Amino acid sequence: MTSIIKLTTLVGAQEESAVCYLLQVDEFRFLLDCGWDENFSMDIIDSVKKYVHQVDAVLLSHPDPLHLGALPYAVGKLGLNCAIYATIPVYKMGQMFMYDLYQSRHNTEDFSLFSLDDVDCAFDKIQQLKYNQIVHLKGKGHGLSITPLPAGHMIGGTIWKIVKDGEEEIVYAVDFNHKREIHLNGCSLEMINRPSLLITDSFNATYVQPRRKQRDEQLLTNVLETLRGDGNVLIAVDTAGRVLELAQLLDQIWRTKDAGLGVYSLALLNNVSYNVVEFSKSQVEWMSDKLMRCFEDKRNNPFQFRHLTLCHGYSDLARVPSPKVVLASQPDLECGFSRELFIQWCQDPKNSVILTYRTTPGTLARFLIDHPSERIIDIELRKRVKLEGKELEEYVEKEKLKKEAAKKLEQSKEADLDSSDDSDVEEDIDQITSHKAKHDLMMKNEGSRKGSFFKQAKKSYPMFPAPEDRIKWDEYGEIIKPEDFLVPELQVTEDEKTKLESGLTNGDEPMDQDLSDVPTKCVSTTESMEIKARVTYIDYEGRSDGDSIKKIINQMKPRQLIIVHGPPDATQDLAEACRAFGGKDIKVYTPKLHETVDATSETHIYQVRLKDSLVSSLKFCKAKDTELAWIDGVLDMRVSKVDTGVILEERELKDEGEDMEMQVDTQVMDASTIAQQKVIKSLFGDDDKEFSEESEIIPTLEPLPSNEVPGHQSVFMNEPRLSDFKQVLLREGIHAEFVGGVLVCNNMVAVRRTETGRIGLEGCLCEDFFKIRELLYEQYAIV
């Protein structure tokens, strides 16, 4: 590679967790995904926090929380402020994921890590792209381009291709699926040939995946047996990703008369179910060819479900007759409707629970998958209840004090506003009278006439007192007081109003009362529960299996491979398989957590800082699209707080900028420099956190004194072709023609290419010889 490429694993290395990586390409830093696990581990936030202000762009691959869950927190709390790129479905469905996740947590606990406003603020920064749309970055990212390609895992799921200067190709492909499904086409990774670097995951490297037909039959059998036994089926799914595949599959099964399921109910239960289906209807062009043909030929939207009932809460679900199949979020059973239904239904042997997703280890769903024989578990029961008794009275008193304080503050502001308005009016009147006094044109006679001897009779006009009330205005116009528009019969007294606000009304409570309108608190208890219902894991994750992953990597033949996101044994298995079929042609890296991989293959490329005095003394010569200069300098090693930097070794230096390449002739301080490096490494190594976050050893190139500058032979670059040089000679009026591969000029000078590939000039020392030599020199960049 001709660029500096580094990858730092912030989250998701040698483990099954969220994914988040920092990719450095020269001076530009990408944050590849920004995921958060189901338990909202703050270790993930601490890892992201160290680098959040260095990030220049964020690339999101999938819409689920494991790929973008930490984005609202990073934007709202950590100050992440950069361009964020994602496909249109990832933008829309990602919002649905985060809305549902927040509401699921908020319904049963005091959740304050991020708010819905943080979600909106984060997603407002996203630049929405289409598949195969090439985006050329600007500024620090000049020369870089990014392209989203279909991943086949979720709607809008992306494989990112990053290209540097049309040469180096970096492919970021995690959680991809090459198989065609009902609602999605598979990815086409094999079309990418010989990338410089491939970053992929090993989540399924050792997983043996059953055939799709076998999984569908298992699902249908489970559902039929449970429903015919008068039981309910809970299918734990995500919010807006893989749930679309299951919804399509089940709705098609329900349409089939032979299945005999038409008499049973099918429901989708999450906080944003209606929005998810509506967004899906408008994104058919992102889905499989089969669904698109159905939509184009029959003009029938595939997400206009016939049998699937959309529910937003338990009251909606209660109206769906039993027995029923319920697709409920979240897939981890840690929160949301799926957890509540699991607690209600798991103690009835008639019911069935189907898990479709291997979530992070430590979650309830993953525990049930890994320990299918465990029938007694301790589970935390969380719920939000209304305040009662003393707690309610204290809450009402606090709210009353808050309202009084807010009212006083508002009144003081209004008083200040009135006084300022009155003073403005007085100033205006004073200004008018002063202007009248100064004005000497169009003066009436009464104003200048002196009083006469006889009293003049004045005509008086009777008037009623008319005090003028000043109307309050703000940015939106006149301020409206709601009490002015109340109907007298509907007005309530202050006591009744207080009772209504505090929830102390007489009579029965409504069955589906919204707890957000009354004061509540969250309570939790731990109970031991016996699982009597049938719990089954059926794989509908939508990922490629281990053998397919290995075949795809073998077809791509990447020069370098970085394996992330997977258990240690799966990571090692995939690495060994890739080394076996790739041999010496592939470098395989298996980084650990918080480890940085240097994927720069050219070992003579380094980053150095140039002194201004050195840059001002350089003499550049143009060579094609670049400018070259010879540098004579001395290296100074020191610790400096900068964003980038590389420890210099005793090798040739070559600094490549945006528009120039510099060939460096350096005098490296042999023993002293190496010793200094070792001392600095020992003093400010990885153990010292004060310097390990941003500080690195930066080689600074300083100019040599003029009396110490060594001479050097001229370097000829940009070798011309003889055919092109012939055209140059003809334009200058010199007759030139090829004779036996030798360019003969005016029958006096011969220009030939030697066996070593260099151009030689032969002939008598005449005026033509020196003119032709000068023209030949002009074709080179001489440094």
UniProtKB/Swiss-Prot annotation:
Pfam families found in the cross-reference section: Beta-Casp, CPSF100_C, Lactamase_B_6, RMMBL
Region (Disordered), start-end ranges: 407-427
Composition skew (Basic and acidic residues), residue ranges: 407-416
GO CC annotations, alphabetized: cytoplasm; mRNA cleavage and polyadenylation specificity factor complex
Subcellular location: Nucleus; Cytoplasm
InterPro entries: Beta_Casp (IPR022712), CPSF2 (IPR027075), Cpsf2_C (IPR025069), CPSF2_MBL (IPR035639), Metallo-B-lactamas (IPR001279), RibonucZ/Hydroxyglut_hydro (IPR036866), RMMBL (IPR011108)
Described function: CPSF plays a key role in pre-mRNA 3'-end formation, recognizing the AAUAAA signal sequence and interacting with poly(A) polymerase and other factors to bring about cleavage and poly(A) addition. In X.laevis this subunit seems to be predominantly involved in cytoplasmic polyadenylation reaction. May also be involved in the histone 3'-end pre-mRNA processing.
Annotated family: Belongs to the metallo-beta-lactamase superfamily. RNA-metabolizing metallo-beta-lactamase-like family. CPSF2/YSH1 subfamily.
Protein name in UniProt: Cleavage and polyadenylation specificity factor subunit 2
Species classification: Eukaryota, Metazoa, Chordata, Craniata, Vertebrata
Gene: cpsf2
